[in-house]
Amino acid sequence: MKHEIEVTTPNNLEEIWPGSYDLFSWLDYVVTIPNAISLVTTRKANGAPNACLHAWGMLVGDRDNYTSLLAMHDYFHTYANILREGEWCVNYPSLDQYPQSFQTINVNHPDNDEITDAGLTVEASKKVQAPRIAECMLSLECKLEWHRPLCEGSSLFLVAGKVVHVAMDDRVMGTDPAERMQAMRL
């Protein structure tokens, strides 16, 4: 049996925590589908490495175009960094790096190196100034193509960037996607 659910917020719905339905749609808590966790890395205004734990993104492409599509709130400093610098990296940590990846939330400060402070290693990128994370087996370097609000009046913006370079560890270079996912331990 399927339940038919209206998409408007029910009047009797209690928030998970204060403001949770202002930051997220209430449907995010009902229609939970697993997404790959990534660390979106940028440079702060002072040049320090920034790392944003992220799960609202996808990769899509056609022919010679491969695009990173992210959803970000306009008041996050990662969003401001992307608009200012016009670039970022999407780094995919394995399960082994999840503790450090989640630590980026706790070491999120205006001027510090969030990557190093979370126990990860900054790695230079090849085509962009945004740093990569050495421990991640897959990193995609991206340049901003466009950004726009999700809907009128939303603080959530869609950000699209062309992937201009890919760094991939030997352990995940195989062509079989199932083997790659297993090796990456996503």
Model-derived features with residue positions:
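Basic, polyanion-binding surface patches
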Residues: M1-L186
